[in-house]
Amino acid sequence: MQTRNAFSWLKKQITRSISVSLMIYILTRTSISSAYPIFAQQGYENPREATGRIVCANCHLANKPVEIEVPQAVLPDTVFEAVVRIPYDMQLKQVLANGKRGGLNVGAVLILPEGFELAPPDRISPEMKEKIGNLSFQSYRPNKKNILVIGPVPGQKYSEITFPILSPDPATKKDVRFLKYPIYVGGNRGRGQIYPDGSKSNNTVYNATAAGIVSKIIRKEKGGYEITIADASDGRQVVDIIPPGPELLVSEGESIKFDQPLTSNPNVGGFGQGDAEIVFQDPLRAQGLLFFLASVILAQIFLVLKKKQFEKVQLAEMNF
């Protein structure tokens, strides 16, 4: 009987442990999957709006630079590098979700011409693999292989991101044309200020939702504040909730206006976008150009030789 009770107790403990582990996994998975650039993938069919604006700017409000470097021209069915640089001061620390300070993450979206896509691993050279590191790229949508996203990844290590790109093969993709194409890029460093549902993160400034007197400020146990604003005209009280992270700028008894900043703006990151051009080169045209240049060089050589021969003849006639 005692053995049976012990077995029953052990069974309950194992079941409880599995349940707790499963719950932690689900919560963790949800937290990770909610990270950028997943937000854009979930909310927008195309990351680039008709105006040319990349949708990441809807959540990352500060404007920061981004750079892209691609070859001037590429041949069909070749692998090349698209290097995206997201510069920022490595000494900066951002406000994390728990209100503490930590390093900045970076992310990027690369919008390639139709037909261009992520190079398969067996086509990537060892030198390029070394530049890529442990990065894992993914398509924006299964049917949009020309749009690639990456992030969030540690900015200290990956402020320069190398995308391995495979150019299309006209032999298998008949709709591809040999033209000059634009490439668009967006890159962010740090967390956003707005979530896709419109709510604020703790990485932005918080403003007063009413005018009046700050009658009470309660500091929460886990960080953040509850600020009670009393409207002197009708006695109505409004409570503004400040999450952990931003620094408080007001004090009790202070008179404030509507939309006045209650906190500092802790954001040190931002988003930027840029573009570049690449020529999808026809091999036959390239060969023709080389042949033309070679013929011009040979013609120049023959002209020089002919001129020297003529000069020798003239010199011989003069001596005669």
From Swiss-Prot:
Cofactor note: Binds 1 heme group covalently.
Gene3D superfamilies per the UniProt record, alphabetical: 2.40.50.100, Cytochrome f large domain, Single helix bin
Major localisation: plastid
Gene Ontology CC terms, in alphabetical order: chloroplast thylakoid membrane
Pfam families assigned: Apocytochr_F_C (PF01333), Apocytochr_F_N (PF16639)
Cofactor(s), names only, from the UniProt record: heme
Keyword annotations of the record: Chloroplast, Electron transport, Heme, Iron, Membrane, Metal-binding, Photosynthesis, Plastid, Signal, Thylakoid, Transmembrane, Transmembrane helix, Transport
GO biological process: photosynthesis
GO molecular function: electron transfer activity; heme binding; iron ion binding
Compartment(s): Plastid, Chloroplast thylakoid membrane
Residues annotated as transmembrane: 286-306
Membrane topology classification: Single-pass membrane protein
Signal peptide interval: 1-35
Residues binding heme: 36, 56, 59-60
Complexes and interactors: The 4 large subunits of the cytochrome b6-f complex are cytochrome b6, subunit IV (17 kDa polypeptide, petD), cytochrome f and the Rieske protein, while the 4 small subunits are PetG, PetL, PetM and PetN. The complex functions as a dimer.
Function: Component of the cytochrome b6-f complex, which mediates electron transfer between photosystem II (PSII) and photosystem I (PSI), cyclic electron flow around PSI, and state transitions.
Database matches in PANTHER family: CYTOCHROME F, PTHR33288
Entry similarity comment: Belongs to the cytochrome f family.
Name of the protein: Cytochrome f
Species, as recorded: Nicotiana tomentosiformis (Tobacco)
The gene coding this protein: petA
